[in-house]
């Protein structure tokens, strides 16, 4: 375990993330430009695909970080039966949900019920599939729909704000089931689908297209929002949310719906819109 990961056990997660939020939304020209230049240089951010490639134009660091891409920079897989990768990034893990458990790293796993904050909500995903995608600071930070769906419910699960970098994933037990997260439940033509937006150290917020800022929230109680009857339907490949710094999205699918795309594995670099899985059509 690295020193940084060890320190995250004792660091004041909330305070640091609050400070990160204040800096991310600062309109001080000197502050925001220093942040943009530092992150661009340190992580090798490529602005050639950005709708606005000039880093000086962004009013805040957060505006830079959640930047839009040029039209056509990402396109969905041409196969209409392909479920899509929800984001640019790197696959942390993917595979079957065996006995209700989701694999995190060697010797590490957690239950779908822990992740979703609800035992009954996890049942439809037992023996289904999951994919965990890590968005690094250099990546495009908007998350899109793998498949068309109608929003049924969101569940805010309070928790810690550990780093979600590779070292933390290997060494912090049940990491994604411990961090603060927003669970988004959708109804699709094949049944339920869940997209879980996981918060992390220095993540200044998670926003959804239907409700705005969802994280951070304060308190230690799970909170739910019922969207049934609201008619919030998002099409395959449509934007659903964005991270205001790097973090992780986990997609859960029920059994018998799709087969994972060949060639995908842990550590694979992926791009929004490429095939994650393909429908199993009888």
Swiss-Prot record:
Q: What is its main location?
A: membrane
Enumerate the cofactors the protein uses.
pyruvate
Q: What does the record say about PTM?
A: Is synthesized initially as an inactive proenzyme. Formation of the active enzyme involves a self-maturation process in which the active site pyruvoyl group is generated from an internal serine residue via an autocatalytic post-translational modification. Two non-identical subunits are generated from the proenzyme in this reaction, and the pyruvate is formed at the N-terminus of the alpha chain, which is derived from the carboxyl end of the proenzyme.
The site annotation (Cleavage (non-hydrolytic)) covers 246-247
Catalytic positions? Answer: 88, 144, 247
Q: What class of enzyme is it?
A: lyase
The record's cofactor note says: Binds 1 pyruvoyl group covalently per subunit.
Q: What does UniProt give as GO cellular component?
A: plasma membrane
Q: Name one GO biological process term.
A: phosphatidylethanolamine biosynthetic process
Its record classes its membrane topology as:
Peripheral membrane protein
InterPro entries hit by this protein: PS_Dcarbxylase (IPR003817), PSD-B (IPR033177), PSD_type1_pro (IPR033178)
Q: Which reaction is this enzyme known to catalyze?
A: a 1,2-diacyl-sn-glycero-3-phospho-L-serine + H(+) = a 1,2-diacyl-sn-glycero-3-phosphoethanolamine + CO2
Q: Where in the cell is it found?
A: Cell membrane
Pyruvic acid (Ser) PTM positions read: 247
One Pfam family it belongs to:
PS_Dcarbxylase
Q: Which UniProt keywords apply?
A: Cell membrane, Decarboxylase, Lipid biosynthesis, Lipid metabolism, Lyase, Membrane, Phospholipid biosynthesis, Phospholipid metabolism, Pyruvate, Zymogen
| Pathway connected to this protein | Phospholipid metabolism; phosphatidylethanolamine biosynthesis; phosphatidylethanolamine from CDP-diacylglycerol: step 2/2
Q: Please state which protein family the record places this protein in.
A: Belongs to the phosphatidylserine decarboxylase family. PSD-B subfamily. Prokaryotic type I sub-subfamily.
Check the record and name the NCBIfam families matching this protein: PS_decarb
Q: What does this protein do?
A: Catalyzes the formation of phosphatidylethanolamine (PtdEtn) from phosphatidylserine (PtdSer).
Query: Which HAMAP family does this UniProt record tie to the protein?
Result: PS_decarb_PSD_B_type1
Q: How does it assemble?
A: Heterodimer of a large membrane-associated beta subunit and a small pyruvoyl-containing alpha subunit.
Q: What is this protein called?
A: Phosphatidylserine decarboxylase proenzyme
Species annotation? Xanthomonas campestris pv. campestris (strain ATCC 33913 / DSM 3586 / NCPPB 528 / LMG 568 / P 25)
